[in-house]
Amino acid sequence: MSDGTGEVVCKTCPRHCRLANGAIGFCRARRAEGCRVVAANYGKISSIALDPIEKKPIAFFHSGSNVLSVGSYGCNLRCPFCQNDGISQHGGDEVQCRTATPAELADLAARFKDEQGNIGLAYTYNEPLVGWEFVRDSAKAIRKRGMLNVLVSNGCASEEVIAELAPFIDAANIDLKGPSQDYYDWVGGDFKAVCRTIALLHEAGCHVEVTTLVVPGRNDSDADIDAISAFIASVSPDIPLHVTRFFPRWRMTDASPTPVATVRRLADIARRRLSRVLVGNC
């Protein structure tokens, strides 16, 4: 959408990047072309693997099955602890990719259905919503083959993008990284947008699970996890929450891992409001 200045405004996420023709957005994955913004990473596959669905992590949806998992490049957040910075924090000229169409991915997913128990396609590894058009088109192709779609996302997207995708997403794990906008200022996101995504997907009938990575000194207080679990419970107390342990990565290699006792304590606090709380990386 043009803003009348010769620039185009990207409406994929709350950042609303203003882009001159040919410019790339903050996410490194969207580009201005004339009066519109397109996914520069459309069909660009950096990573592909057949994973147990529990690895997403999704614990209460087709447990014991596998899901063909694909990623591209780019992300609209800058979490200093990113575990996939090799693809999420780099652009298309820095990430080695192969090209695939939605139909080709759907055919590959179907091939693994009988041989290896594959239930469908998971959009993951980088932030899939910065290339939401490819997610939408692939999800439609998967549905035509009678298979399922799984989204693993930071959830920081516009209401319009979520509304476009929700009818085709069967299960999702959304990161709720912290309890407030103050935390999201640190990682470069929008707290209310993430909360809205969780609520919208749940309202659409999608199976939703949530992950919170516990970072020492940032979101590891009792009040932090209580606020996170209170919001989730306001949507549904039955939404599973994964409380996971931080390990030093990317720009936080000098930090210490979260003590296991801290993760377990916070999980116990979350269980006061939520019926299904799991610990991860412990």
Language-model features, listed with the residues they occupy:
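Conserved radical SAM core fold
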Residues: 88-89, 125-130, 155-162, 171-188, ...
